[in-house]
Amino acid sequence: MSSYFWAQNESNRPDLLCGQPADYLVEEKHFTTLVCFIVVLGGLLKMCLKNCEVIVLTILSLSGFVIGHMAYNSVEVHQIVYPLLRTSSFSLYSYFSPLIIFMVALDVEFYTLKKMFWQVLLTGLISFSTASIIIGYVVIKFNKDSWDLQSCLLFSITLGIIDPLRSVNSLKTIGISKIYIDLIRGESLIICSIASIFFGNFRGNRIHFSIFRDLHVGIELSYDILGSIIFGYWCAKIIQCILADVFSNMLTNIILCFSMVYMTFYIVEFLGMSGTLALAAVGLNLDSLTFKPKIELVITKFLRIFSSVYEHLIYAFFGIVIGCGELSHYEFHTIPFIFILFTTVNLVRLLTILLVSPILMHSNYEYNWRWGVVITWSGIKGVFNLLWAPDVYNLAERKVEVPQMFILYVQVISLLTMGINSYVMTQSARKLDLCVLSLPRQMILQNATQHIQEIVQNTITLFKTEKILTNVNWTLVEDKTRIEYIPFSHVSHNDMKTESTTDEALMEEARLHVAAIQMSSFEKQRNNGILEIEAARILIGAAKCYYSIQGKFMSIYDVSTYMRTRSWLIKFKNVLTFLEYCIEKIHFIPPESNTFLTFIFHIVFSEEFEYTGQIINLIYIYPMIIHLWPMARGLNVSALISINYYFMFLYVLESTLKIIILKRKYFQQCWNTLEFFILVIGIIDIFCVYFVKLRPDNLALIQLTVIMGYLRIIRFLPLFKIIVPILIRIADVQIKKRLSLMYSITKGYIKSQEDAKLLIKQIAVCESIYQKLCEILETNKQDAVKELVLMEHEGRDVVIALKTKQAIRNVIAKALKNLTFLCSRGIIDKHEVIEINKVLLKKLKALNNFPKAIPPPTPDIYLHNIIWLEGKDVLIDFFKERAKLACFDSGDTICKGGEMPQGIYLIISGMAILHSLSPTFGIESNQRCDRGSRDMFTEFCTTGDIIGELSCLLKREIEYTVICETSLQACFISLEDLYEGFDAFWPSLEYKIWLKLALSTAYQYFESSLIDEDLRFQNCVMFNQAYVETLSSYSDMIIDNMTMKFVIIVYGSVIDTKTEEPYFAPCIIPTTCEQVQGTSDLSKLLIIQASELTQRNSNTNVMASVNTVFEQPGKNINGRQKMS
């Protein structure tokens, strides 16, 4: 293949695609104009004839035919198209096919193809074999041209290829399941790869049918397939590494991506393998997570633009090639033969689907005869058939007189299948109700439409309050923005009336939406830097694998494949730890008079003694090689015997010295036992050699001696002691990597469950479905939380490293965001922004080498992590003097529900389980009549969690019971010490604890409403973005909606003084309420300031800091120190 690709033809005149050679001086400067003309014409036709691509390609083919016929009759036109005619067919294939193959493979869902790989592979093989045999037979039977057998076979292979670009384009716009689109595309990729391998072997080796019986053909095919896949896989890894660089910009990434595609194709072809298969492997191993969000969009657009332009050029070029032939060759029998071929192609496709239907029915519960009908019409031909058509003539054993007939048949058949098959396929899908939305899906769409209408109406209501919009005609606005129904082309209105739905169908549709929300959440977390790319890829892959399993909600146990790997690594490490040789000095006090024992003691427990033993084992390698080599052994028998005696003497000496000192403890170490066993085997070997000298005619004794000689290899086993520590370090690194990965996966899964829970109100079409979904999501979340807590207890150092790394990433991301803000306001010049951006990105890139484990801090350092202490040394020192270390064993009770609190516990290590009824929030049961039986819930507490804050603040009974799941250490601050701190730092300390509890309660219950608010504790303290108000019984508070964006009651209850409507914690008080009155002994309200006021405070601080930095940086720093 490589010789054909690079070498020139043996004759001085190159092979022509078609037409006559030029007998004049050729100038190629006008060919570029022809290419530009075709591109412009194709673009204009595509713009005028939207959704009529087959007509565009037909017009371009006819235009090319006209240009080719003009070239046949005119020297001037022939001079323009001659560069095309002298271009080899493989060159055209190399120019156009790589980008199209890459785009198609990139669009195929890898996880779907992986799950149905054997079904897709069998479908592709059966389709290729059936088409090659039947089409070849029809061509031999009905074609009147004198084609040889090899030409017929190559033509049948060419016509049997299914175009991966056109075969599914018409299905993507009518709502067909993505599974079947990937099935068809996967099949077409396999067929294209097989065809490229066949043509490559024909092109490179000029093989004939007789050679197919030889063994080397099978070896070459294996080399082509495996080599191409492996090369493509590693090229995909290289592209992933290139795109993962944080310093690379969009333009660089796009250029490198396109360059790597072509370079991969050319290198693989040069090595004699299949470039098509290699690029298919590259595209399948890249996914949406490989590219940054904006880059993926741009690359996809570029691929679509180039593939469309290439398609127009291919059809126009081959139209020119056909037109360059003599018209007298196009006889009447050409037309019937074309229709025979068209009918044969579709019948072959029908036979293929009949053969593979049992396989597809077994692999997919949705497959039935209706899908078979639609897939039957998916055998559409396109650009790949055309690109391989000229090779039928070039690789034929016997050259035919009219080579352009191969191209004519393929081009006409491809246009017919594009027009007829595409139309029949889409109409069949519609008539057979395969693209009609199910009733549950239609109900969800209707629910979503209503939700959008509510958002529109709420927006209009909000705009009506703005003074600048008072003179707007709101009636006209409401009329123009009213959404009565969103039309979908694949919605059946009759089914809405006739189809009956069940909870199972609604639940299944909701399950699919939950899976889609989860996958979207995983990708969003990856783009935001929360999830590592490997963790996101595993989660998305697992979600897609379980997506097609009816009734299956993915749990954390379904994605814990790496847990098994991790446990295997732990067991492997435990075995290595057991085998690790460590010298433990025994309590040995040698007698003062016995200097000999003292001398041996120092020898045995010295490092030099161990090194000497290892050196002896290494030196024995050479005599062992001589012993195993028969010729050398025969020449050095006596020398080998003497060396064996010498080494056995050293082994005896080593063991004797150890036994003298260690005595019975000698056999407690496994390596000592092994050495003693080697010593015994060696002594037996010596005796066997000695007895063979005495009885040289004893065959059994000779055989035993030979076996004992080979057993000398076990003398090298102690060398494994050197490798064991290295293997332990490698295993430890891998365990930490797996634990880190699994921790990231679990955190990402929990976040996806929370995201799904926020959106299930739009998914669920009835209350019962909503309750079931909430229950399933909460159960799965609790399971994941339990796994997360166990991992935190199991690998504290790894979890600390992960959390620290994530905190650094969040800080840098915030800095990049603020840098963009300063640049957009013109405060910093763009050049300065680039320099600062490089510094921040360098720090972000340095996180790739961040340690996998960080030792946990000491107990007193954990006080710095208490948020309401704010890291102030005065507060920390105050509580450090009074804090005590409390230790609990597994099963101990830290605190019990109904008891008075003793103080607060800050967990340092370990895990505890909190059992409680749903919290009362300070509301008596007689106050809240709508409160029925309180549900029981479980929460897991681990390192860094605080137990007992609220109970200590209120001095009321604890509402929960906390039991240690593992051994636990906690920093204990007694109730007396806590209130002593309240008195010493009044009132800020108690207020900050209430603020922290109020913020956590608000986020826990109203995260969807507060998602756009920046309610970090430090911001609330510094900028007063949110604050806590206290109401006692019968005390009032006025709500100013101009300054208060949200008023959330987080503890106790209040009533609206105007309507006397009660509000119980936790609850967001509506904006219609103007004044509230406390109805509990103690009520706490979290006030979130309006965005304008908050933004003003924030901007004032930011701009003040900016001005100060530019003007007086030193003064700013001193001022901060005074403030602190």
Curated annotation (Swiss-Prot):
Pfam family, one: cNMP_binding
Swiss-Prot/TrEMBL keywords: Antiport, Glycoprotein, Ion transport, Membrane, Sodium, Sodium transport, Transmembrane, Transmembrane helix, Transport
A biological process from GO: sodium ion import across plasma membrane
Membrane-spanning parts: 25-45, 52-72, 90-110, 120-140, 179-199, 224-244, 254-274, 305-325, 335-355, 372-392, 405-425, 612-632, 641-661, 674-694, 706-726
Membrane protein topology class: Multi-pass membrane protein
Keyword Cell cycle: no
Intracellular or extracellular location(s): Membrane
GO CC terms in record: plasma membrane
CDD domains listed in its UniProt record: CAP_ED (cd00038)
InterPro entries attached to this UniProt entry: Cation/H_exchanger_CPA1 (IPR018422), Cation/H_exchanger_TM (IPR006153), cNMP-bd_dom (IPR000595), cNMP-bd_dom_sf (IPR018490), RmlC-like_jellyroll (IPR014710), Volt_channel_dom_sf (IPR027359)
Family: Belongs to the monovalent cation:proton antiporter 1 (CPA1) transporter (TC 2.A.36) family.
Function according to Swiss-Prot or TrEMBL: Involved in pH regulation.
Protein name stated in the entry: Sodium/hydrogen exchanger 11
Name of the gene: SLC9C2
